[in-house]
Structures are given as C-alpha cells and as structure tokens.
Amino acid sequence: MWVTKLLPALLLQHVLLHLLLLPIAIPYAEGQRKRRNTIHEFKKSAKTTLIKIDPALKIKTKKVNTADQCANRCTRNKGLPFTCKAFVFDKARKQCLWFPFNSMSSGVKKEFGHEFDLYENKDYIRNCIIGKGRSYKGTVSITKSGIKCQPWSSMIPHEHSFLPSSYRGKDLQENYCRNPRGEEGGPWCFTSNPEVRYEVCDIPQCSEVECMTCNGESYRGLMDHTESGKICQRWDHQTPHRHKFLPERYPDKGFDDNYCRNPDGQPRPWCYTLDPHTRWEYCAIKTCADNTMNDTDVPLETTECIQGQGEGYRGTVNTIWNGIPCQRWDSQYPHEHDMTPENFKCKDLRENYCRNPDGSESPWCFTTDPNIRVGYCSQIPNCDMSHGQDCYRGNGKNYMGNLSQTRSGLTCSMWDKNMEDLHRHIFWEPDASKLNENYCRNPDDDAHGPWCYTGNPLIPWDYCPISRCEGDTTPTIVNLDHPVISCAKTKQLRVVNGIPTRTNIGWMVSLRYRNKHICGGSLIKESWVLTARQCFPSRDLKDYEAWLGIHDVHGRGDEKCKQVLNVSQLVYGPEGSDLVLMKLARPAVLDDFVSTIDLPNYGCTIPEKTSCSVYGWGYTGLINYDGLLRVAHLYIMGNEKCSQHHRGKVTLNESEICAGAEKIGSGPCEGDYGGPLVCEQHKMRMVLGVIVPGRGCAIPNRPGIFVRVAYYAKWIHKIILTYKVPQS
C-alpha cells in the first residue's frame, strides 16, 4: 500500500520542480496567445456548414456581428456548455453556431450553404505538432513504443493529478496524447502498462510532415507558422499588416486561411506574421525527397521563343530589350540580389541568360548598368502555342479552336458566367453557339484576335497566344482611307531642338523612375496614362510615380499645380504594340493645369502633310538644357514615302504612322518615349501616335515612326470600360 501513496507524492515533487523551472523563454507561437486574433487558429471552409445527424449533439447559437467574435468565444469557451471545436458564421443572419464537434466527428455531415462559412479549430484536425506540441488536440493514443495510453480520467493502472477538471482548456479527453504543461519531448500520456508509468508519443513536427518542390510556388500545405515560430496572419485579414495579396484578387495562389505560400517568386514560402514588429518571415518547409514538380506545374521549356510569361524559357539571350548586357545571376555586382542559382535551383539561372524565376510579365535580368537594376528581355519573340497547327484569319472572329489559356498563362473562365460583362461593351447579341466552354473566342470583333475572360479580378480578360495564319493578308481594319482620327498609345522619346511650350499641355505626364524622369505619357482618363512598354526597366511598381501639371521636368515653380500619383497596375497592349496603359493608384484631379487628351476614332487616318506635334522632356541637343517641356512640329507622311526615306529598309504596317520634321534635326529622342504625337482635326486635338524607340535620334531626312493609336483605339476603350479603377 505504501507504493500507491508514494507515487502521487513523487509526482507532486516532480510538478513542484517543474514549476520552479517555468520562468524560461517561451516561443512566440506558444507564449503569445493573448495577443493573437483567435480567428487565425481556425481553418475556414467557405460556403459550408455542418449538419448534425446525431440528435444528442449540442449546438449553441447567438447573434454576433463578425466571425472574429465567434472565434474569440469558441477559443475561450466563454458561456458555452461544452468544449468548442468548430463554429459556423451565418453571414445573412449575423449569427454564430458553436459546435463541440467538427467535420471529422461521427454523426455529422458537411453541407453547402452560400450564406455560411465553417471554421474548425486547427488543433483538433492537425496531425502534427508545432514546437513542444502544447496546443496539440489530435486523436493519437499510442506511445512511441506502441503502448496504449491510459485515459486521463482514470487512476488505473497509474494514479496521477492530471485530471480533466484540473486542467480546463487542455483537452484531457479520452486517452489522447497531450502536453498540458508544454514540457520537452512533446505530447505524452500515462500508459496502460503497469510497468511503464508514462511515455512520449510519436507525433511528428509539422515541419517534418510538410515538404515542397522547387521554391514552393505550388505548395498548398497547412504550415501556418514561420521558421522562428511566429503565427501567420490570415491572407484575408489586413491586421496587423496591410498587404495586397487578397484571396479574391489572386484566386489561383491558394491563399487559404493563414498558411504559408509563395505568390511572388521568393526563394521559399513565407507569410505575414501576427507580430506587429515583424511584417513577414519565411516558413520552415523542407524540400521533398522527390524534388520534381507535378506535370501541371511544369512550364513548357523553350529556347527560341517564350510561351505565356516565359517561365520555361531556357534560351541564351543575355541582353535586355535595348541591348544592355545582363549581369550574371551568381554575381552581386553591380546589383546585390537574392535571385541566385542556390536559392532558385529549379529556374536554370545559368550565366547571364534572361529568365523569369519569379512569375513576372516576361523574362528579365539584372543589368550591368549600375543605374538600371532590372530590365525586361522583350525582344524575345512569343511562341505560337499550337506550333502552327492552330491559327486564325483576319481578326479571328471565326476562330473555333480549343485553346483556353491567355498569353500570360491564366486559365480562361466559362463564357456563360461572363455574359453580363460581355453585354456591357458590345451593342449586339453575341452568337452563343460559338461561345463554347471557356475556349478563346472573339465575340466583339476585336481587331487583335481571340481573347477570353479570366478568374483574376485584376486581369478581367486578356488575349490568347494564337497567331494569324501564315500568309493571311486579310485586313483587320476596314476603310483605312476614311479621314477620321483614331486612338493612340505612347513611348518615351526626347524632343531635339524643339521650342519651349507652356499652354494647353495638361495631359502631359512625366513618368518617374526612382524619382528621375524616364518617359513621357498622355493622360487619357483620370486614372489612365498611355505610354510605352520600354519605359519600365523595373518590375516593382513602387519604383514609379506619375507627375502631372508640370512644365519643368524637375518640378521647379510647379509646386502649386503639380500632382504626384503612384502607379497601381500596368496593362500591356496587344502583341507587338509596344503600348502600356498605366493605371494610377488614385484618379488625377482635373483643373487648370491637369487635363485629359482625346483619343481618335478607331481605324481612322489623318491626311498626309497634316501638321502635328510631339512633346517631351528628353535629350534636347543643347549643352545647357533648362529642363522645360519642349515641342517639335512634324507633318504626317504616307507609309510608302516614309519607307523611301528609310532607304527601303522599313516596311510600315497598319499599326504604325509616320511623321517627318518641319525643321531639320527636330524630333523625339531618349527621354521622350511614351509621349504623344498630337494632331488637330475639326478643332479637336488628339493623340494620334505614341513615341517609341526609333532608328536614331532626330536624324535629318529620316522621319519618325510612331505607334498608330487609331489602330489600338478599341483596345484602349475596352480596357477603360472593363478594368476597375479606384474612386476619387
């Protein structure tokens, strides 16, 4: 009998010794629960509820305003007659339903419900432990050596003081392994073997269970804490850290709950943290033993052209679009970076070849120019996705192929889900018989080929990577000789030997790259600037600003009229256009100094010898450049005559317009790219062309070739109509 009395005494001595050792550092993940927003402890299943089949199961309901309030009560079990394992938030009735069970429990079934969201406490459904496993509430009931656990409420064969009533909130239920005091070794239990009092259980660390391939772009596991133990912030929450990665904006990135993800091409998955002082950290996810990507995740490798966004490009082009050589990926000079071959083993970062390791718009590289960190390799041609077997004639309005992916790699969404949007920008009833499934089509007679809607709110639609059939000469614009003006886009150039201008140029935009002027642009709507693709050497939009209402490129004397706006999105023009529509973070305020310029009508032409003007802050040919906006006067030249001036080396097509200088040596140069060729007709000024990098700078008897805005007018109007913009 003395043995049974001595064991509790020894256990009490052990407990007292443990209490003396308690004041040690507790990891953030296990010691900061009071600071946490408890909604992060739950796995969310949208549009789902639980229906109890067993009538004996209890449910508690109450009116609440938010799911966060439901989570707080469930976590604390405040006012609940049971241990809460899950809850459902009824969004329509603003009501919470708390459950002592979850979707894994018997006597319960899942059911779809548009107004419901199901939240299940992760601790009850997780099959691994974090840290010491203090929060583990799974159902493992066997020790490491295979002995069955003794129930916590039983004193046979071992007496103990770890009673469920003494450890409320520790879930000492049944005979499940637990670690109520957070001791070293992880969850444990008293055993059913009289010879072995207690033993730890063999429950793996979550970091051992989870694994990723490559850099984890396709990782969709359940890791929800960082490598230092910090709990991740939910992707659908903006506290404590505001961010852009909202699940509804990026439906293909797997932004479920607060699980680690890699949406932006980092070396490995990461997350925002609940620590207000630590914005984000990487997650400790090991590489899978079979470090090969699934077939659905592997981009098609190409060497001569790019497909989609060029993530599979493995060619040897090693300069950016303007000829600047690329920096070696394994070098940190002149630009330091973490895009090294060691960090991105699956991305073929050899030598200094153009690559797209982070899912950017197209292949790129760091440059050897210390002043230009990054540049796109946009000179690499796009592949025909169907290798010549799938093509369209004319503008593709009769295309009936089976391609269902956009040029940027997004999967097309079903046409029948987008008919309301389609009716907003066409004035006739589309032929529904042609709009099969989610195949690329051209129901609105778009001049630039088949397209489709996407599931991405930021890119509601885009063109498909289908080429015109070889030898097809069907014009995509009819009545090209009609004397009406059309729409435009711009590129960056500098006006050489122009005269200063001040009046009626409120639509001129100075695009700034790291606070220095790099390109011109035209304000065509309060939230949209038309400019050139070559104006964006960096992929980071935070590097850019738009200055409006200025005359001096440095802003001197323009303080009262200058507006400085951030850039929120770049929408690239149809294939080969070199155009970009730049969306501003907030609308420009139209006043005496800032105004918009009109677009021409689609497909129109302007008569030869019409006097037009180009504007810009680029290279002037003057030693002491004063930084003022300049204008140079040009006249429209026919395509045939323009080709003669270029000694037959240039053949202009329907997407280009030519203009020669009235004054020898005048014209656009570097720094003016993206700016407008402005013409007037019927007392209306409009942007007819966009300045793009040409063949030399203001060369005598060498007219300039511009992007013809009229050819792309419908595309511009379609973007403005269908893309969401911020409200003023």
UniProtKB/Swiss-Prot annotation:
Subunit structure: Dimer of an alpha chain and a beta chain linked by a disulfide bond. Interacts with SRPX2; the interaction increases HGF mitogenic activity.
Post-translational modification: The single-chain precursor undergoes proteolytic processing by TMPRSS13 resulting in an active two-chain form. The single-chain precursor undergoes proteolytic processing by HGFAC resulting in an active two-chain form.
PANTHER family to which the protein is assigned, alphabetical: HEPATOCYTE GROWTH FACTOR (PTHR24261:SF8), PLASMINOGEN-RELATED (PTHR24261)
Residue positions, PTM Pyrrolidone carboxylic acid: 32
InterPro entries named among the record's database cross-references: Hepatocyte_GF (IPR027284), HGF/MST1 (IPR024174), Kringle (IPR000001), Kringle-like (IPR013806), Kringle_CS (IPR018056), Kringle_sf (IPR038178), Pan_app (IPR003609), Peptidase_S1_PA (IPR009003)
PAN domain span: 37-123
Keywords: Deafness, Disulfide bond, Glycoprotein, Growth factor, Kringle, Non-syndromic deafness, Pyrrolidone carboxylic acid, Repeat, Serine protease homolog, Signal
Stated consequence of mutating residue 494 to Q: Loss of activity due to absence of proteolytic cleavage
One annotated GO molecular function: growth factor activity
Signal sequence region: 1-31
GO biological process, one term: regulation of branching involved in salivary gland morphogenesis by mesenchymal-epithelial signaling
Keyword Transcription regulation tagged: no
Disulfide bonds: 70-96, 74-84, 128-206, 149-189, 177-201, 211-288, 232-271, 260-283, 305-383, 326-365, 354-377, 391-469, 412-452, 440-464, 487-604, 519-535, 612-679, 642-658, 669-697
Domain Kringle: 128-206, 211-288, 305-383, 391-469
Annotated SUPFAM superfamilies: Hairpin loop containing domain-like (SSF57414), Kringle-like (SSF57440), Trypsin-like serine proteases (SSF50494)
Peptidase S1 domain mapped to chain residues: 495-721
Encoding gene, per UniProt annotation: HGF
CDD domains in UniProt: KR, PAN_APPLE, Tryp_SPc
Sequence similarity: Belongs to the peptidase S1 family. Plasminogen subfamily.
A GO-annotated cellular component: membrane
Name of the protein in question: Hepatocyte growth factor
Record function comment: Potent mitogen for mature parenchymal hepatocyte cells, seems to be a hepatotrophic factor, and acts as a growth factor for a broad spectrum of tissues and cell types. Activating ligand for the receptor tyrosine kinase MET by binding to it and promoting its dimerization. Activates MAPK signaling following TMPRSS13 cleavage and activation.
Glycosylation sites: 294, 402, 476, 566, 653
UniProt disease annotation: Deafness, autosomal recessive, 39: A form of profound prelingual sensorineural hearing loss. Sensorineural deafness results from damage to the neural receptors of the inner ear, the nerve pathways to the brain, or the area of the brain that receives sound information.
